[in-house]
Amino acid sequence: MASKNREIIKLKSTESSEMYWTVKNKRKTTGRLELKKYDRKLRKHVIFKEAK
Protein backbone atom coordinates (compact mmCIF):
# COMPACT_ATOMS: atom_id res chain seq x y z
CA MET A 1 0.00 0.00 0.00
CA ALA A 2 1.25 3.48 -0.83
CA SER A 3 2.43 5.74 1.96
CA LYS A 4 1.02 9.22 2.36
CA ASN A 5 3.45 11.72 0.83
CA ARG A 6 1.30 14.81 1.30
CA GLU A 7 0.68 16.68 4.51
CA ILE A 8 -1.94 19.37 5.26
CA ILE A 9 -0.25 22.50 6.59
CA LYS A 10 -1.28 26.05 7.44
CA LEU A 11 0.45 29.17 6.18
CA LYS A 12 0.42 32.15 8.57
CA SER A 13 0.92 35.74 7.47
CA THR A 14 4.02 37.53 8.76
CA GLU A 15 2.15 40.84 9.04
CA SER A 16 -1.36 39.93 10.26
CA SER A 17 -3.37 37.01 11.68
CA GLU A 18 -4.54 35.81 8.25
CA MET A 19 -4.05 32.07 7.46
CA TYR A 20 -4.23 29.75 4.45
CA TRP A 21 -4.51 25.94 4.41
CA THR A 22 -2.55 24.05 1.75
CA VAL A 23 -0.98 20.66 0.98
CA LYS A 24 2.76 19.96 0.92
CA ASN A 25 4.71 17.00 -0.47
CA LYS A 26 6.89 15.75 2.43
CA ARG A 27 9.42 13.97 0.21
CA LYS A 28 10.19 16.83 -2.19
CA THR A 29 9.82 19.79 0.20
CA THR A 30 11.65 18.91 3.39
CA GLY A 31 12.13 22.47 4.68
CA ARG A 32 9.51 24.96 5.80
CA LEU A 33 7.33 26.47 3.09
CA GLU A 34 7.38 30.22 2.48
CA LEU A 35 5.08 31.77 -0.14
CA LYS A 36 4.01 35.26 -1.15
CA LYS A 37 0.20 35.37 -1.17
CA TYR A 38 -2.60 37.92 -0.97
CA ASP A 39 -3.59 39.02 2.55
CA ARG A 40 -7.31 39.93 2.58
CA LYS A 41 -7.09 41.93 5.81
CA LEU A 42 -4.23 44.15 4.62
CA ARG A 43 -5.36 44.04 0.96
CA LYS A 44 -1.83 43.46 -0.37
CA HIS A 45 0.63 40.63 -1.04
CA VAL A 46 2.76 39.55 1.93
CA ILE A 47 4.95 36.57 2.87
CA PHE A 48 3.20 33.59 4.45
CA LYS A 49 5.28 31.08 6.42
CA GLU A 50 4.49 27.51 7.37
CA ALA A 51 3.15 27.14 10.91
CA LYS A 52 2.39 23.99 12.89
UniProtKB/Swiss-Prot annotation:
Gene3D superfamilies reported in the protein's UniProt record: Ribosomal protein L33 (2.20.28.120)
Pfam families: Ribosomal_L33
A GO cellular-component term linked to this record: cytosolic large ribosomal subunit
Alphabetical GO biological process terms: translation
Keyword Iron: no
Keywords: Ribonucleoprotein, Ribosomal protein
UniProt xrefs under InterPro entries: Ribosomal_bL33, Ribosomal_bL33_CS, Ribosomal_bL33_sf, Ribosomal_zn-bd
Molecular function GO labels: structural constituent of ribosome
Family: Belongs to the bacterial ribosomal protein bL33 family.
UniProt protein name: Large ribosomal subunit protein bL33
